[in-house]
Amino acid sequence: MAGYKENNNIDNNYIEKLVNIRRVVKVVKGGRIFGFSALVVVGDGNGKVGYGTGKAREVPVAIQKAMDKARKAMKNVPLVNGTLHYSIISNVGAAKVYMQPASEGTGVIAGGPMRSVLEAVGVHNILAKCNGTRNPISVVRATVEGLTSMLSPQLVATKRGMTVDQITGEE
């Protein structure tokens, strides 16, 4: 049952993507209790993204719990013209994620769970690669942490007391 599944629903102006559903088992004295775990990514397509996991005895309930958690955990991502400001490397557990801005017309070149996060946040041109593990939860966490750790040139300039042109080297 483990694997990559995608569901595009636009609800309340949010893009909701179902990344993974797993059947989980709890072994007790009287036998086995089956349940389901869901991983969902929610974004507005304009620089906000969140992810959540939910567990329940039935699939729809697990998905709904995950979507509620994802909506509550939304974070801002600074984007420029549908891509990133600069290259990012992010690690979570064994997952190592590399993301690099791309020129217009490149598209989203990323695999599996990373693609869901990038499409939900509103990135249209990017080159991305995941190394180390293919665990969807770790890959989604690493991708979101990398995107949210990125700082815009305006923020860096104000922190340093400089202008954006001085930061980017255009002066």
Swiss-Prot record:
Gene3D superfamilies: 3.30.160.20, 3.30.230.10. It holds the Pfam family Ribosomal_S5_C. InterPro entries: Ribosomal_Su5_D2-typ_SF, Ribosomal_uS5, Ribosomal_uS5_bac-type, Ribosomal_uS5_C, Ribosomal_uS5_N, Ribosomal_uS5_N_CS, Ribsml_uS5_D2-typ_fold_subgr. One of its GO terms (molecular function) is structural constituent of ribosome. GO terms for cellular component: small ribosomal subunit. PROSITE patterns: RIBOSOMAL_S5, S5_DSRBD. It comes from the Bacteria. Residues 14-77 form the S5 DRBM domain. Signal peptide: none annotated. Belongs to the universal ribosomal protein uS5 family. Part of the 30S ribosomal subunit. Contacts proteins S4 and S8. The N-terminal domain interacts with the head of the 30S subunit; the C-terminal domain interacts with the body and contacts protein S4. The interaction surface between S4 and S5 is involved in control of translational fidelity. With S4 and S12 plays an important role in translational accuracy. Located at the back of the 30S subunit body where it stabilizes the conformation of the head with respect to the body. This is Small ribosomal subunit protein uS5. It comes from Vesicomyosocius okutanii subsp. Calyptogena okutanii (strain HA).
